[in-house]
Amino acid sequence: MVETFKKIGIYAGIVLLLAGIAYGFVPQVLDGKIVNQSDIAGWKGMAQEALEYNKANPDDPTAWTGSMFGGMPTTAITDNFEGDWTKPLYKFIMMGKRPGSYLFVTLLGAFLLMLSIGTSKTLAVAGAIAVAFCSYNMQIIQVGHNTKMQAIAFFPWVLAGVIFTYKAALGGQIRKWLPKTVLGAVLFDKTAL
């Protein structure tokens, strides 16, 4: 029991360390300051006409705007996301101040990814820092490619999930039938398995 609490304490400490690193990199967000993202300012200009129309006509939202390229569909600019059941979960995961929350989610996911490939906790923390703070991530945060950064933040989570699932599938009885299902039973001597 004591050993279990010790392990939980170590991982809780690592999570707090990763949160400290994420928000230590952008402490200004804790004071309410925001990153001036040029693409977000551009989006506000692109979407303004459609947003104003939709606010004035909630029963008849527009699917077209004249504010870009002489006219274009609004689905590429703004859309109605009612009925998206993942939104509450997503808001919970990204509940911190942005861009600190992007960095924290990336750090935590990359830490799990490093653990999934069998690295030590220390090396996993170092690898997570390398993944989260690569120069591309900093560039896309600065210009305002927020949805791209959010997608990148979840890449390590997905990869770690696949690896952990694969490793779990290799345990126990599954190990005996997996080669047959993947490569075909004709390649194996049935008595050897």
Q: How does the language model describe each region?
A:
Residues 2-7, 48-49, 108-113:
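Short alpha-helical segments and helix-capping/turn motifs at coil-helix boundaries
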Residues 7-14, 103, 124, 148:
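Residue-level signature of transmembrane alpha-helical entry/exit and packing/kink sites
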Residues 20-107, 129-156:
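Membrane-interface coil-to-helix junctions
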Residues 107-117, 122-193:
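Membrane-embedded helix bundles of polyisoprenyl
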Residues 6, 10, 95-98, 158, ...:
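Membrane-interface helix-boundary signature
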Residues 4, 90-93, 119:
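Juxtamembrane loop-transmembrane helix junctions in multi-pass integral membrane proteins
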Residues 1-26:
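Start-transfer (signal-anchor) and selected internal transmembrane alpha helices
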